[in-house]
Amino acid sequence: MTDSRYIGRFAPSPSGELHFGSLIAALGSYLQARANQGIWRVRIEDIDPPREVPGAADTILRQLDHYGLHWDGDVLWQSQRHEAYREALTWLGEQGLSYYCTCTRARIHAVGGIYDGHCRDLGLGAENAALRLRQTRPVLQFSDRLRGTLIANEPLAREDFIIHRRDGLFAYNLAVVVDDHFQGITEIVRGADLIEPTVRQISLYQHFGWQAPDYLHLPLALNGDGNKLSKQNHAPALPEGDPRPEIVRALRFLNQAIPEEWQALNIDDLLAQAVANWQPAKIEHSQMAPAEL
C-alpha cells in the first residue's frame, strides 16, 4: 500500500436487518477509523444468495445512515466482484496453490472434522468438486490490538481450506481477503466470533504476497440464553426511532465514556464526542449480555 492513512470498514452480510450486536461492530469500527483521522468504508457481503433476505442490504444502509454512521466513498458489493475473485483463484492455480476436492462433509467428519488432504495429489477435475488452498504458509498465531497474541488451533490452521465451494459460490475467506486488499484496509475491527478464521485470512494474504491488516476483535453481545445476538437467533432489529439511546447503550457495552448531557446532543454531536473520547484499551475482552450494563 502506498497510502499510509488508516482505512477501516464495516462489512455486513444482507441476511437480515442490523441488530444491537451489529451496531457494536459498526460503531467500534467507525470510532476506531474516525479517531485515527481515517477512512471508514462499507462493504455488503452478498456472495451467498441462499442466506440473503430480499431488501436487507438497502435496509442496512438506511439503518447506518439513520444512526449517524456515514461511510466514505461508494459501497462495495461483493456480488459485483466475481471477476476479481476468479482472477485470484486463477493466480493461485497457476502457482500450484490450489486443487479440487470431492470429499463430503460426512467423510471429513469421519476423520475427525479436520480435512486430511485426501484429494491433495489426486489431480481431480472441477466437476462436482470444491477448490481448496494447498496450504504452504500456515499461520499459527497473530496479534490482536485488544487481546494481544492469539494462538491458533494448529490442525485447523494447517488445514487445506475451501476457497471455492462445490455449489459454485466463492468462499468467504477468499472474498474477504481479496476485497480488503482491494480497498486498502489497514485494520479490521469486528466481532470476536471471527477470530477463528483470521489465521486463514492472514495465510491467504501471505500466499498472495500481500500485507495483512491489523486486527481488533470486539466482545460479543449475548442474549438471555448466553448465545450471541445474531440474525439466526432472531435478535430484534435496531429501533427506527431516536438512534441516540442505542448508540449510548453500545458505548456503555464497549466501556466508553458517555457525555453527561447526551440527551441534549444530536446524533452527529454525540458521535463526535464518542470519537474524541474513544479508548479501545478500555474495552472488556469477555462477551456479555447488554442487559447487564
From Swiss-Prot:
Binding site for L-glutamate: 9-13, 45, 172, 190
Keywords: Aminoacyl-tRNA synthetase, ATP-binding, Ligase, Metal-binding, Nucleotide-binding, Zinc
UniProt enzyme class: ligase
GO molecular function: ATP binding; glutamate-tRNA ligase activity; zinc ion binding
Record flagged with keyword Signal: no
Motif ('KMSKS' region): 228-232
BP-aspect Gene Ontology terms: glutamyl-tRNA aminoacylation; tRNA modification
Keyword Ligase: yes
Positions annotated to bind ATP: 231
Binding site for Zn(2+): 101, 103, 115, 119
Cofactor entry: Zn(2+)
Positions of short motif 'HIGH' region: 12-22
E.C. code: 6.1.1.-
Annotated Pfam families: tRNA-synt_1c
InterPro entries listed in its UniProt record: Glu-Q_tRNA(Asp)_Synthase, Glu/Gln-tRNA-synth, Glu/Gln-tRNA-synth_Ib_cat-dom, GluQ/Sye, Rossmann-like_a/b/a_fold
An example Gene Ontology CC term for this record: cytosol
Cofactor details (free text): Binds 1 zinc ion per subunit.
Function description: Catalyzes the tRNA-independent activation of glutamate in presence of ATP and the subsequent transfer of glutamate onto a tRNA(Asp). Glutamate is transferred on the 2-amino-5-(4,5-dihydroxy-2-cyclopenten-1-yl) moiety of the queuosine in the wobble position of the QUC anticodon.
Family (UniProt): Belongs to the class-I aminoacyl-tRNA synthetase family. GluQ subfamily.
Protein name: Glutamyl-Q tRNA(Asp) synthetase
Organism: Klebsiella pneumoniae subsp. pneumoniae (strain ATCC 700721 / MGH 78578)
Lineage of the species this protein comes from: Bacteria, Pseudomonadati, Pseudomonadota, Gammaproteobacteria, Enterobacterales
GN (gene name): gluQ
